[in-house]
Amino acid sequence: MNILRDTSLESNPYLKINFDGGDLSSDAGLLLIKEFAEKIGLVKIVYQLFKTNDTATFRLHIDPENFLQMVYQTIAAYFEDDCSDELTVDPIFTAILGKPALASQPTISRFFNRMDDTTLKQFDQIEKLMRDIVYSIKAPEYMLFDLDSTLLNTYGNQEGEAFNYHYQARGYHPLLCFDGITGDLLKLELRDGTHYCSNGADKFMEPLIREFRTKHPSLPLYLRGDSGFASPELYEVCEVNACEYAIRLKQNSTLVALAEYKAEDLRQVTKHNMVDYAVTYGEFMYQAGTWSHPRRVVFKIEKPVNQFLFVYTFIVTTMESEPHKVIRFYCGRGKMENFIKEGKDGFDFAAVSSKSKIVNANRLRLHGLAYNLFNWFRRLVLAANMRKLRINTVRLKLLKVAARAVRSARYTTFKLCSSCPYKKEFYETLQNIRGLQPQLE
């Protein structure tokens, strides 16, 4: 029978292949993820807090196990529920979950379908507790809230999906807030496709800002957002909670008129040279019709190379820095696009294929937690020469390592690939995990 299953290569008929290798896995690096998740208390917290509205009196595969299975699968790039069927007896997955077989695709799908508003609140609790633990290891010097939205494409009749005119595509339009320094995903909310960027942004950010202000009273807080988030309600939330902000304003004739004094200076500077780049900065106090009081607006006027027209940038801010420093601070929010790209490409944030919006919201939150677990892993314990790498590269180099399980009466030994070129980084990461001293209580 083995002869029938063997396949010879046309390039070399003396080389044969089959999938009868036995107790092998290609995901030995997940042992590091498991060790880290245990060390920072995530596994214990999930078992304590996460439970769906399940009426069954007995489950072979309980909710916390299903939860962690999908987190590990997401980190290993097995995004689909169907992948569970192929991984049922994978020696690495069964070892890190401590069970003889994984939950099947129907079990995982039913698990997601049981999720509701209550489980969304449980995600909030889990993420708050995990932030406290992670900050006990390495506390931030200041917090930089980067606020943005993105499009998650849909291709069916999902509840809440719609055509979004900004992106010119159908989908959901979730709201995201990242730590602009570390890349941690601080908050995530799935919204209908028709929602405008700033819709509910103040209610979205207020609990998060208050959490940091309450737990870290002396921590400097900053917020950045593009013109889609230019709403007085968000300004006031920041001002009440002593959170400095720099939010772009859409250009209009009033703002351009107020900046005219600097535009005239730029015309004088460039009148004999309309080819080279030129720039000037300024500021003024401004009160829009919907604002309760005047606010500081800084601006930049630049003349691009080989262009005659000026380009204006207006930022409303509570920061006291010089205009050019505020502009430079705001422009740093471009890093957030990389965080969003990492979430969508590396952790499949677009896994919103259920007909139910609430189920899709829970799926998104689970993928967001997988993103955070890896991001904490990367910046706290990953080998130093790998900490700037993206998830796909780390998967290739450190997570997708072949291993053979050798079982004895008392132990299971995983014999990893002898020719792995990243043994040093593997052991360095493991040593870093052992050196962590998180405050779990």
Predicted regions and their residues:
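Structural motif
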Residues: 56-65, 305-306, 354-364
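Short acidic (Asp/Glu) and glycine-rich catalytic loops that position anionic groups and cofactors
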Residues: 9-15, 46-50, 88-91, 306-311, ...
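Short amphipathic alpha-helical "interface-anchor" segments enriched in bulky aromatics
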Residues: 36, 84, 325-362, 366-377
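Basic, amphipathic alpha-helical segments enriched in Lys/Arg and hydrophobic/aromatic residues
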Residues: 349-416
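Short, conserved catalytic/metal-binding motifs centered on acidic residues
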Residues: 36, 69-70, 84, 104, ...
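Dynamic "connector" segments at or just before major functional cores
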Residues: 1-196, 201-215, 378, 401-441
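Domain-level cores of phosphate- or acyl-group-handling catalytic modules
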Residues: 196-254
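An anionic, glycine-rich sequence signature occurring as long contiguous blocks
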Residues: 2-13, 244-345, 403, 428-441
